[in-house]
Amino acid sequence: MRKWIAMLLAMMMTFSCAFAEDLVFTGEVEEAGMTDEEIIEFMYGRYEASSLPNLVLPEGKKDVTVLTHYDLGPAKELYKELFGGEVIQIICGVQEYASKLQNLIGAGTVPDLVVSESTTDPCFVTLANAGLVQPIDAYIDYNEPELLDLKSVYEAGLWNGQHYLAPYDNKPVYYMIYNSKLFEEYGYETPWELWEKGEWTWDAFRELAAELNITDENGDYICYGTGAPGYGSLTGSTGVDYVALKDGFFENNLTHPDVVRAENYLNDMLFKDDIIKIKAQGGWRNYWNRGMVAMQIIDSWMLKGSAEVSQAIQEGTLGIVPLPQDPQKVQPGVNVTYAQSGGFCLVQGAQNPEAAAAFIRTIAYSHRYPEVGETYEDMLAEWHEDGWSNDLLYQYQVARDVENMVTSFGYGFMSTHRVWVFLAIQNNWTTFVESIRPLAEESLRELMGETTLAE
């Protein structure tokens, strides 16, 4: 795994580059640096021209009222610029959605949309079974250019033959980041280099995490291989969700052999084999800031919302890579992990459903196209201003490629049933599941009413 071997092999290869899906990011391209044209083509070249800017909404039917637990940000201004309508927010907590909708509908002040994400609990099924939201099929088409790459996520949210969840984005639950400076200093191939060779697996992660636990002459740690990962971070690469949403029922996979195998593997790294050191488990941010953590699995929001990550980007030491893949299922270049979709449900009795659909399209559009009067070069310049290099942007795009990801509906459900406790104590997954299974199954039955729970 020593880096000089990879460098020697790289010197024997000829430089090549290509656009769009033919672009292969090799070590020598990384050293030479991707051009602005290459990264723009890779990030945005697959999107055809959208008809959204030419869409006309009826007068008096342009405003959209949204029940949400977060501010909808710049998309509100873009929607107003495109359509002349207002986006009106009603803020409340996720757990309040059902009761808030009941009250609003009862009072005759019906919002058009309610935020719904695949990883939140309760999920959209709760709202659908209660008659609080309606199918959105008649109002939105996921063959539109800005929605096309979300079509598989749209289909994943099928419930009783109809679509209730309308996603505007999909991303991994987690990313893996690493400190490239430490890998160079200690002479190891980076996770990205292993990913490029199709060798970035649980076993490779485990080996690097162990070998990069480095002490000085006094026995004090000067480098930790990794801190504590999030729950489900390895399980996602098996392609099996804890509780999988099917069309009309949930499939309980808590005792699925792949889930058992992944959960026990990570628990062993934490406790049985003492690879993830106790000091780095809860305090990885402190050690990361001091340049003492080689790799870390982080929540996806942290990639753009964490001071620790932002600092590493500015310093040029950050690397991004897909999570380690299941060694029994790994395919070179295929990123399998849990994904989470941001989206909305159309509220029963919504006054402006066409405008609601246009707003969903607007958010998706804002992630994929320049704003009015801007260019793709302007979009790239904003990334550069934040310290992102073209090569880091390439890694980011590969790590967030959702084509083979599992849109997880069980992740949020299991969070409320304390699945994360399993990573806090040495345990066996099968034994642990028996302690939470009765309550989990009861909750699923409540969620689905009379709908079948598949074993």
Regions from the PLM with identified roles:
Residues E81-D149, Q162, E185-Y186, A294-M295, ...:
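Extracytoplasmic "Venus flytrap"/periplasmic binding protein-like
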Residues P135-D149, L194-K197, E217, D241-R261, ...:
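Short, solvent-exposed loop/beta-turn-alpha elements that line the ligand-binding surface or hinge
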Residues S51-N54, Y70-G85, K181:
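Short, polar/charged alpha-helical segment
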Residues V114, L158-D169, Y174, E184, ...:
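Extracytoplasmic/periplasmic solute-binding protein
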Residues L23-G60, S118-V173, D203, V321:
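Hinge/lid segment of periplasmic solute-binding proteins
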Residues L23-E48, Q348-P353, H367-E455:
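Conserved C-terminal helix/tail region of periplasmic/extracytoplasmic solute-binding proteins
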Residues A209, D247-A280:
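Glycine-centered hinge/linker elements that transmit conformational signals in sensory
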Residues S310-A381:
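Extracytoplasmic/periplasmic substrate-recognition and gating elements
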